[in-house]
Regions:
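Flexible loop/hinge segments that line or gate small-molecule binding clefts
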Residues: 149-199, 218, 315-323, 327
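Bacterial lipoprotein signal-peptidase II cleavage site
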Residues: 25-37
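Extracytoplasmic "Venus flytrap"
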Residues: 45-97, 101, 110-123, 127, ...
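An alpha-beta-alpha
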Residues: 79-85, 98-100, 189-246, 251-252, ...
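Hydrophobic alpha-helical
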Residues: 138-155, 231, 237, 256-320
Length: 393
């Protein structure tokens, strides 16, 4: 039975503040895994047909090199990056990367800050238009909340690309509005657009949970449903859990971004008390892990009996993983790489050519696999060098 601890609110507009607290934020072939982290019960043999073997954990990941096709950087362009909230690491990291990439391409670049207040977003889009922007990159700002200004931008021929942002035509908004984004990051043939990409990301998180619990996952699932991208990652996760005959989501805990901290920790504590049968926890994003879920897991005294799938895997969450403090694994889709991919997409739009494969995917990280000794995750691919060479800069 699903336990809901708060009520879902509308997706459009209201989710921007919480969206700024996260990235998403995805399925490749199986690979033989190293031993599971030592604070997780050993994986039991899987029943025939059950996706529960340790070899089903995709430690190889799905990151690959971006397309190397030559695509010269456009000349004399001005780009405005609109951040959902620079006070949040989930916004500041990809935005800084996009700014770095745009400047490497030789473009004049400005960053506007919505400051975690959705009411500021329409005015900032109009400010970018008035400033003579050739392109606008929206970070965690969905189309419905800025529909009017985007229509104005489109009328002026301004190119628009999103970073973890969803167009007005996205099915999740349940309308028939035409798209207002000029293009989107190319996530590859298997997940060409962000909805499919993020569903697959969530599915791989679930596969790791299923394998770590021997095909008998009993999951407390946390989500912030006003955030569009989390509905996609959540769907991918839950759909994969449903394929497992002996797995179940025993509690679904919904929360708003404003509840991060003591309120979320209390919800997590209550869910853990109400579900002693739970052996797994799913966090939707890093801030939720840090500001509620991981502390509740540690204080429950059950950390050694729970497999906790964390969020995006920013450096503070990796520190918890290294210390065994309420996080067992994270699935990382590198946000700095995403910022560069957004600029590459913008460059293709300026040239009137299709967006090239970004190479973006994700990397599962746990205590024994793919974890650096300290600091943030560093992908093996030097994506910056590849993009610069392709742009001729």
């Amino acid at each position: 039975m699903t336990l809901r601890l708060s009520r879902t609110t509308t997706l459009a507009g209201a989710g921007l503040t919480a969206a700024a607290l996260l990235l998403t934020a995805c399925g490749g072939g199986s690979t033989t895994a190293d031993p599971a982290p030592d604070n997780v019960a050993p994986v039991a043999p899987a029943a025939s047909g059950a996706p529960a073997a340790a070899s089903d954990i995709n430690y190889e990941g799905t990151l690959r090199e971006p397309a190397t096709t030559a695509r010269a950087a456009a000349k004399d362009k001005k780009v405005v990056i609109i951040s959902a909230g620079q006070a949040s690491i989930s916004s500041s990291v990809p935005v800084a990367a996009a700014k770095e990439a745009a400047e490497a391409a030789g473009w004049q670049t400005d960053v506007y800050d919505v400051q975690l207040n959705p009411a500021n977003a329409p005015g900032l889009v109009r400010q970018a238009i008035a400033a003579g922007a050739d392109g606008i990159i929206l970070q965690a700002v969905d189309c419905p909340g800025v529909k009017g200004p985007l229509q104005e931008a489109k009328a002026k021929g301004i190119e628009v690309v999103g970073i973890y942002s969803f167009d007005c035509s996205d099915p999740i908004f349940e309308g028939n509005d035409p798209p207002l984004f000029s293009g989107q990051i190319n996530y590859g043939a298997d997940a060409a657009e962000i909805g499919k990409f993020t569903e697959k990301y969530g599915a791989d998180q679930a596969k790791a949970v299923i394998a770590a619990t021997g095909g008998k996952a009993k999951v407390i699932f946390f989500n912030s449903p006003t955030v569009t991208v989390l509905n996609y990652t959540g769907k991918g996760f839950k759909d994969e859990i449903e394929k497992c005959a002996e797995c179940e989501i025993v509690a679904e805990v919904e929360f708003a971004g404003s509840e991060l901290g003591p309120n979320l920790q209390q919800k997590a504590t209550s869910a853990l008390l109400q579900h002693p049968e739970a052996n797994a926890v799913k966090s939707p994003y890093t801030s939720a892990t840090l500001l509620g879920i991981a502390p509740a897991v540690v204080q429950s005294g059950r950390a050694s009996k729970l497999y906790v799938m964390g969020g995006e895997g920013f450096a503070p969450e990796l520190d918890l993983l290294r210390a065994g403090q309420g996080v067992n694994a994270v699935n990382i889709a590198p946000s700095d790489w995403t910022g560069w991919a957004a600029v590459d997409t913008m460059n293709s739009l300026f040239a009137g050519t299709p967006a090239q494969d970004s190479g973006l995917g994700w990397q599962l990280v746990d205590k024994d696999n793919n974890l650096t000794s300290n600091g943030p995750f560093v992908p093996k691919t030097d994506f910056k060098a590849i993009y610069k060479k392709a742009w001729g800069v």
